[in-house]
Structure formats: structure tokens, C-alpha cells
């Protein structure tokens, strides 16, 4: 059983010769199951369209005949084996000719079972034993009776199973061959008074069961739907009579199946997961992530489907095996990660690139796993305390590693690259939001004294600083952030000092500061921006000063430098100075 395919087993049940196999053939859109009184089904025959496989009609019929013949000699329950057939499609569930607009989600693997009539077969008791053992296979039961059949013993038995195992049940009355619908009054007539009375009697019996078992308000069992397989086979496939309404009962019946599936996706997903846990040999983190994907896809915003019914919803819960798998997986992975974290921290300044990368990847995988598991938090028995304990424990150990590497100064270490810092801060923001300011400032502080300003580095630095500025939460952190930005800008001035166009650059920066920042400076406050302004002004002054030893005590303007720059302007021999980097950084600290 594959995780991603939610298996839904629909069993067609009823007494002998009520038209079960004929009904199956109508759903399949092809006569695969033998019909007629002499063609009674003796062994469960299952059909699935999953994979849209090619099939051979005669081969399927032959296999069914062989299985039925062999079943006649069965003398013990354990020898009853079902026959599985793969076909291309279920016509009635997939075609739109009946005006049914809703479609069954492709993630569902539908299996339709043509079941033996357990009431009068010579192996009746064995089949009843088989059913009591295998009833949990079924997700939806279609109970078929006929308009002249008063024997509801099997119905009574199936109702008890429906309640015990939370199975959906759709009830139909077949052989309503003279049924008519008055479209003006929406009143159904079954053709004769006797048939009308029997139909009322059957549904009254259904109402009594609903009252007796308190199942009236939760849609586990439908009222009996009148259908005529005979009419559908004739009218439904006869293009000359396509406007006739004799097959309208089938439209209601098929809509009931489709709605039972589409309206209870989470219910079927939970049953599927419980089955998979029970039979799967491989149980891993990947399996759990797949389970969470299934639940998320099945519209798990509400706790359970049927949440307004007032029924005991705990029956829909995931199995104890599932919760044990969750607990064991989280505990095991978290413990291994903590051990790795301790080793990395103990390495201190000798932290290894591979060991750090290894543990960092493990932690990201673990936290992604925890996020996926949270889709189950509204289910009973979700181990919230355990999940939170190990999530915080892993994050705390990760922060211990970050403390170590944040003490370094950036000198092209891989783990202090801007791209990696982005990942660290995103992770902290998501899982430990209160620590974001602290570690954002720590990490960017490591880049305050960089030795080079290539364009790609400047672009990355702007992006990370903007990300930090957008997410800082308090004024104190913003002031510290401004200090770091000012350090970077002053360091850039130092980097440019020996460049040919330094004087032009530093004057451009001074003018930029004056236009962008100075209007926002308050008189009664001295902060990092004041230091930046005064340092820039001083650097302009130094750039045009005479630095010879004779001018040590009294700095004069270096006329050579000034005239040289003016001469360049005169000759047009100047450089285009870009201060976009500086402008973008200054825009980030205007909030001061």
C-alpha cells in the first residue's frame, strides 16, 4: 500500500439476487460481473481503476467463473480469498453524462467489491465469519435490497458494523422499475400502491434504526434511495431515450457515493494512515511527512469532518501506533542532533566546516519535520508537550553554535556568508522569534570590518540589512543596528582611501549624508549617525589637507590635490562615482 494513494473500499452488500452484480456492472460501465439467478457470486470480487490499466473482458469473466467454481468446495473461512481486477475506469463515477459536476479526487484509489449474498448460500455461515473478520476493510457500504424483499436481517447486521467501525453506509432499493418522478411536485411514485407502501415501510424501518442507534444526525447511513438497474441499463445507454427520467435514481445514488468520498476526505485519510502504519515495514520521518501532506491536502483546517454532528469524534483519531511513531521519531532525531551540537560547541574556535554544515542541515530537516507534524495538533493524543520540548531543546543547542561562530570576524568563512546568515535568521525568526534581534545584530556585526566591497557582496549586504531592519522589534535594537551600518559605511570610506577617485567619492558621500540623513537628526541626541557625519567631514578635510611632516602642527590645504582634481574637471577626465550602496544603507537607518 503506497502512502500517497488513499485507498477507499466500497462494498456492495445485499441478499441473493437483489441485483448487486448488476449494480456493480452499471458503476463499472461494463458487464464484468456475471448476472442472473444461476450466476450468483460466491466469492468477493474487487475492481479498481487505479492506474487505468488495460484489461480483457473475457479474461476477467473467466477468472470470476473459476473463483466461483472453486468457492463451492471451500470448507473453511481462511480459504475464502477475494479476486482483484484492474480496469481502465469506473464510468459512472468518472463520466459527467448524469449531470454530476463533482469529481473524485485523483489521490483516492477506489476499489469496488461485489460481495456474495450471505443469506442463503450453502456457505453462508463461513461467509459471515469472513465478514466479521474483514469488515474493517470497508470504508463505504452500499446496502442493496429490492422493493419486494422484506428480509432486513443483513441490514441489521451491517448497521451494527457501521456503528462499531465508523463505516459510511448508502442504502438503495432496487427493482423500482415503474418508478416515476413528478417534476412539478418532486413526488416519487413507484408505479403501484403495493410498491409505494413497501418503500414507505422500508424507510420507516430505517427511521426506527436511526432512532434506536442514534444515527439520525450524522450522515453515517442514508435513507433508502429507489433505483432500477434494469431501467438504467436500458434508458441510460439508449441515446434515443436520453431525455427520459427513468434513470434519475442513479444520478442520486452516484452523487451519494461521490459526496460520501469528497465530504469525508479527512476521515478516509485518517483510516488510510492507520492502515499504512499497521502494515508498513518501513516507518520513518519521510513516512510521517507524507502522512502530514495527505492530511493537509484533505482540507484539515477543521478538526474532523462531521464536526457538527455531535458524534464521538475520538473514534476518528489516529492510532496509538501512529502516535508512538511520532514520539519515537522526534525523540530519536532530537537526541542525535543535540549530541552533534555539543561536539561542535566544544570544538570552539576549531569548529569544522563539515561538522557545522552537517548539524545545521540536520536541524533544518528536523524543524521542517516538526512543522509538518503540527498539522496533527488538533487531533486527540497529539503529544504537544513532547514536540515543544524537543523543538526548543534543538533550537537552544543551535543557538549555542551560533554564539560560537558569531564571535568570529568574517574572513570569507563559509558559515558566515551572507547567504547562510539569511538561512540562520529565517530559522530563528520562525522558531525562536524573541531571539531574532539578538542574533541578527550578532551576525551582521561580524561583517563590520570587511576588507573588500565587490558589487555582488554589496548587493548581498544590502539585502540582509534590509531584511534585518524590517524585522527588528525594539528601539534599542534599531540603535545598535544603526551603529553597525555606520561602521560599515566608515569602513567603506577607509577601503576607498587609496583609490584614484577617493576625493570625489568622499565628497559625494558627504553630500549624500547631508541630503538623506541630516534632516532627521535631532539636536538633543547624539548617536551613531552623528559619528558618521563628523567622520565623513573629517575624511573630506584630510583628503584635501597637506599631510607633509612640515604641516603636522598646522594642516594646510594641499593645493596640489585640489588643483589636480579641478584640472580633471576642466579636462573632463573624471569618473562616475556610484554611491548607491551608501544611499541604500542610509535609507535603512533614517528611522533613527
From Swiss-Prot:
Residues spanning the signal sequence: none
Pfam families xrefs: Dynamin_N
InterPro entries per UniProt: Dynamin_N (IPR045063), P-loop_NTPase (IPR027417), Small_GTP-bd (IPR005225)
An example molecular function term from Gene Ontology annotations: GTP binding
Superkingdom assignment: Viruses
Protein name: Uncharacterized protein R618
Native source organism of the sequence: Acanthamoeba polyphaga mimivirus (APMV)
